[in-house]
């Protein structure tokens, strides 16, 4: 499932950015981890507890992945029909791609127009353009993933309100 892979990617990225392999569990950067993860996946904030003593980075990553998947499965259970949530996933993903892609095209145009200034800095404009374009593309892909997962976790089903007919 695409959304499940995206969730795993987000957890891996957040843990990879915030947690060092060679640091003890009680000294991990929990604030940074929460700042990266919680705006996208609404888990409980991660804090050090005694049962985490001796925990490895991979263990934390696995624990957070399991919690995030469990939370998403609970969100799926809110939908009466599984096909409806799959359709919603497709629509949300397409909208995120469309939005990020149009922004990316605009950003690439601005990069193309401004890249000539790199020659003044004694740098090869073509090399700088390729490096910047790659970074921007990577940022776009990450943004698509984050937007899609954030929206899917925060989506709610609205039940149609049944009204009694007004007596004439």
Language model feature labels by segment:
Residues 1-168:
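Extended, charged helical/alpha-beta scaffold domains that provide interaction surfaces
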């Amino acid at each position: 499932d695409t959304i499940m892979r995206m969730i795993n990617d987000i957890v891996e990225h957040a843990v990879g950015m915030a947690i060092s392999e060679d640091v003890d569990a009680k000294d991990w950067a929990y604030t940074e981890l929460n700042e990266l993860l919680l705006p996208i996946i609404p888990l409980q904030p991660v804090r050090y507890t005694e049962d985490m003593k001796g925990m490895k980075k991979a263990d934390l990553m696995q624990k957070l992945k399991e919690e995030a998947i469990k939370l998403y499965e609970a969100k799926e259970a809110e939908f009466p029909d599984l096909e409806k949530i799959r359709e919603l996933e497709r629509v949300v993903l397409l909208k995120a791609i469309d939005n990020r892609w149009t922004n990316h095209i605009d950003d690439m145009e601005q990069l193309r127009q401004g890249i000539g200034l790199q020659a003044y800095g004694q740098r090869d404009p073509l090399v700088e353009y390729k490096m910047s374009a790659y970074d921007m593309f990577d940022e776009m892909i990450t943004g698509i993933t984050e937007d899609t997962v954030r929206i899917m976790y925060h989506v709610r089903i609205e039940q149609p309100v049944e009204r009694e007919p007004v007596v004439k």
